[in-house]
Amino acid sequence: MLSYVVRRLLEMIPVLLVVSLLVFAFIKLLPGDPARVYAGEDAPIEAIQAARVQLGLDKPLPQQYFHWLNGLAHGDMGITYRTRQPVTEVIAKSFMPTLWLALAGFAWSVVLGLLVGVVSALKRGKWQDWTLMSLAIGGISVPPFWLGLLLIQFVAMPFGIFSVSGFNQPSDIILPAFTLGASVAAVMARFTRSAFLEVAQEDYVRTAHSKGLRARLVTWKHIMRNALIPVITMLGLQFGFLLGGSIVVERVFSWPGLGWLLIESIQTQDQPVIQGLVMLFVLEFIVINLLVDLLYAVVNPAIRLR
């Protein structure tokens, strides 16, 4: 297990290097002058030129890249052009609201998605199955921003129970978490149902039934354990989506997270923050994929990581 983890961590290095090069190149292709953004729109030419020298933008692009990469390796992402604060501190401040939002949306969507998927599979072809899968299709089809606006219009504003802006108290997370997790719950329900029905048709399941084992024991010990393996992969991907793809939901609810920070940084052309956020999103997906692989062995000890 340890050797597998070490090998996977080493494999992350070339991936991150390639991604860092692509991110750097993409940022340099964006319109606008970073030195002017740093010095201010009304700054004189001399101040803009001084800012260009201070930020190292007068150096060749390869030298700029390796300087940024060296700082990145030491946890230094530079300073923001807008507030002159360290990018690491700005991202860290916005990371926790996004993490809490992702965890809340993930928790309820996984529980509901797994439950609905299993019930639908057990009631295959019956009215319960048709009803639950119809709701799941509806959940997948509804855009998150539209669902969020509906909740604000018909739940938050008429009753005044939930806040629709910011993160000031624990209850403020309810509507954004529901909005963020709705499509995930629907996807998980359909995926769990498919995985459950596929495993239920395997020979070892029929053998277990022929031996006279109780249906509940066969369901949870033989079917569910093996059906969870592909489901775990989907869980990892969906959690990565919740962490990196909450931009729209954060915008709708004015949630002070990474998505809101990314939009602000794009609008103000704050390139160091954009670079740092993209690298963070990529790192999140890589780490989540590693954790998913490790969970395989926990769910089914017959699987060996090599």
Regions found by a protein language model. Give the residues of each.
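Hydrophobic aliphatic residues
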Residues: 26, 30, 38, 42, ...
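An internal, D/E-rich "acidic patch" concept
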Residues: 58-114
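N-terminal signal-anchor/signal peptide hydrophobic helix marking the start
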Residues: 6-16
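Hydrophobic alpha-helical membrane-insertion segments
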Residues: 17, 21, 138-145, 235-240
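Membrane-water interface segments at the C-terminal ends of transmembrane alpha-helices
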Residues: 23-29, 59, 70, 134-163, ...
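Hydrophobic alpha-helical transmembrane segments of membrane transport/permease proteins
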Residues: 15-66, 85, 156-175
